[in-house]
Amino acid sequence: MEQNIFDYLVEGLDLTAFYSFIDSKTDIDKNTPKLVFQYTTWSALFNGIIRSNEEDDKNVHVFSTNCQYLNDPKEVETGEQYVDMALNGFFGNSGECDDLRHRNAIFMTSFSENENSLPMWNMYGKNGNGVSIGFDLGLLRSHSGGTIKRCLYDTPLNRTLFQNTLSKERISEVENSGDKFQQYLMTLMDFAKKGCYEYEKEIRLTRQVIEAPEYRLSENFIVPYVDNVYPKEIVKKIIIGPCNDFDRSTKSLQGWLHKIGMDHVEVTYSMLPYRNN
């Protein structure tokens, strides 16, 4: 078996605080929400996520986008910065980071713990005219085939706390695994996010994809993605945005869900005060 290069580098390091900090920010086994939400448009709900054709009447589709084509084009740079800090803090250089930097086959899906948030309606819910879809996190985890964690937000406090976990001091009796250390570096790479997005409370699904992706058209370019297929039971709730016509939207949505065998989905309406100019 080929030896991990980090086996030698982490020998004798006390990594307890480093691992504990990352776990405390990203682990979803603590205070686990039952549902996570995606804010989106009616078109994406009707023509992409849930499809009413007979050939696909038992599935829900959730796209994962290549990490280089996310809404924030510099998204991956935050993760690279945290990995650089870790390697410089422990070893005095970040040269061993190159393999992680070029993980172009990582695809991501974003969810939020916020089911009804004004800035989220504004950013992703078509200015309050869209919907917020609640997914069962337990089913999502059991069917995802990837990794699901909370995002680590790069706030001044988090950066300081993180830097305080880094030390070059060696303790002879400590035994470490290079594989484990590299896994935590990958968590930093994939789940660190700019602090200005902290309000999103993002829970992220990441997948490393070997097969050729699909492609879809965005406003500005063609985006590579993979289609994650789940049972329809994964959708538990749909919240209608605050700028929609409440009566007509609710009636037609409930009628459509009944027709396609999804009566289990709770339909509610956002009552947030939203000015849509």
Give each language-model segment a name.
Residues M1-N277:
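Partner-binding and oligomerization surfaces adjacent to conserved cores of proteins
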